[in-house]
């Protein structure tokens, strides 16, 4: 099977599964955006995905994403920055990302605001909420109170368009409870801005649980692209 047929088959399978999960949750398939996480995969795959109708791709490595976007022919894609962000990468990230999912501290808001002002740009953002029962430094995410304070900071600057909240299920915990909590933070956020209703949650292992709890943006990698095989 050639690569485009493989991707087509994977996409069909994923869309059918997402549709089934939406039906079980009493939701519309059209209300869910599937982000194809293309990190570590070549620009040729992104071009093929675009040919197959994919509209959203996700990357978490700045240098890789910037180089890849320059090699992708489609201009109709929305590029999502989904990984933890170091402040020294912000200037570069705004050159390729349309949406940032991991705003989790005030320092990041301030640096993005400064760089966006210099570039004369604006950007869509999600505030990342830490869903680990015991917060881990390397996982990213703000506490509930911090997330709401970050949302207020984002809303006070016209360079940002606040989309909603983002979360990553705990490595060793109850994904359903975690996503229920994220949904409750989303409701609180919407008291600040009723239009910031999006929930970025759900990856290849837990997207059905995320859909049940209101996820609007799924970040799916291996289900669409497959698994990397390494030699040596």
Features from the language model and the residues they span:
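Conserved alpha/beta-domain cores
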Residues: 1-205, 211-213, 225-227
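Gly/Pro- and small hydrophobic-enriched strand-loop and loop-to-helix capping segments
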Residues: 215-232
């Amino acid at each position: 099977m050639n690569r485009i047929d493989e991707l087509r088959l994977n996409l069909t399978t994923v869309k059918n599964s997402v549709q089934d999960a939406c039906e079980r949750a009493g939701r519309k398939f059209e209300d869910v955006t599937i982000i194809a996480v293309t990190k570590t995969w070549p620009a040729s795959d992104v071009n093929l995905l675009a040919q197959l109708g994919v509209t959203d791709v996700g990357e978490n490595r700045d240098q890789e994403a910037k180089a890849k976007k320059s090699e992708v022919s489609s201009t109709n894609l929305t590029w999502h920055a989904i990984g933890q962000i170091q402040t020294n990468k912000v200037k570069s990230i705004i050159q390729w990302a349309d949406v940032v999912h991991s705003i989790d501290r005030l320092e990041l808001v301030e640096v993005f605001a400064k760089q966006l002002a210099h570039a004369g740009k604006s950007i869509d953002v999600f505030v990342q909420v830490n869903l680990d029962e015991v917060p881990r430094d390397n996982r990213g995410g703000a506490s509930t109170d911090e997330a709401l304070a970050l949302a207020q900071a984002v809303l006070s600057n016209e360079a940002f368009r606040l989309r909603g909240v983002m979360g990553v299920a705990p490595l060793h915990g109850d994904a359903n409870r975690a996503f229920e909590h994220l949904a409750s933070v989303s409701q609180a956020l919407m008291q600040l801005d009723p239009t910031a209703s999006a929930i970025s949650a759900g990856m290849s292992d837990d997207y059905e649980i995320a859909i049940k709890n209101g996820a609007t943006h799924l970040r799916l990698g291996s289900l669409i692209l497959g698994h990397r095989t390494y030699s040596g």
